[in-house]
Amino acid sequence: MARPPPLPGLVGRRNGRAVDRAIGWRLFLLLWHPALGAQARPPRRAPGGRWRSRRVFLLVRRTRAAAYAFAIRRGVVRVVGGGGQLLRPAPGEAAAAAAAGFGAAGEAGVAGAGLEAWRHPSGPARTQLGGQEGAGGWLVVGFLLCLFLLMPP
């Protein structure tokens, strides 16, 4: 039996900008990990004929679809069918993704050109910094965590 085509996948391109930290690692774990990613196969049948981990498989599939929808609503990614690049969605792509069941139409839009200014549905226009404005807090947290872990008992 022929293998079904892969689910829509995401391929990253950073361009010096940090991926939105609210979803970056979740997307990485859900979409790129070989066991949970876009190439994940359905579970094999157990010797008794029942699916060994059907519940887990359905949960992963549902969570992955929710991650796609959240990322598209945030304007971080576009869904591509057979490979491509991780880009901000063009105006028509949000509607196409919504028609495919990955998000609400019109929630991810592009505003402006030139300096790559774009607008979140819930926030101000962003520029090429793309989320790096608040990176100092994460540096402080990481530094304190390292101090805590390296302290002698």
Curated annotation (Swiss-Prot):
Domain of life of the native organism: Eukaryota
UniProt main location, coarse: nucleus
Topology with respect to the bilayer: Single-pass type I membrane protein
Record field: transmembrane: 133-151
Tissue: Ubiquitous. Highly expressed in testis.
Residue ranges, Extracellular side: 41-132
One GO cellular component term noted in the UniProt record for this chain: nuclear membrane
Places the protein is found: Nucleus membrane; Mitochondrion membrane; Cytoplasm
Keyword entries, A-Z: Cytoplasm, Membrane, Mitochondrion, Nucleus, Signal, Transmembrane, Transmembrane helix
UniProt keyword annotation of Zinc-finger present: no
Membrane side Cytoplasmic: residue ranges: 152-153
Cleaved signal peptide residues: 1-40
Disulphide linkage map: none
Protein name: Taurine up-regulated 1 protein
Organism of this sequence: Homo sapiens
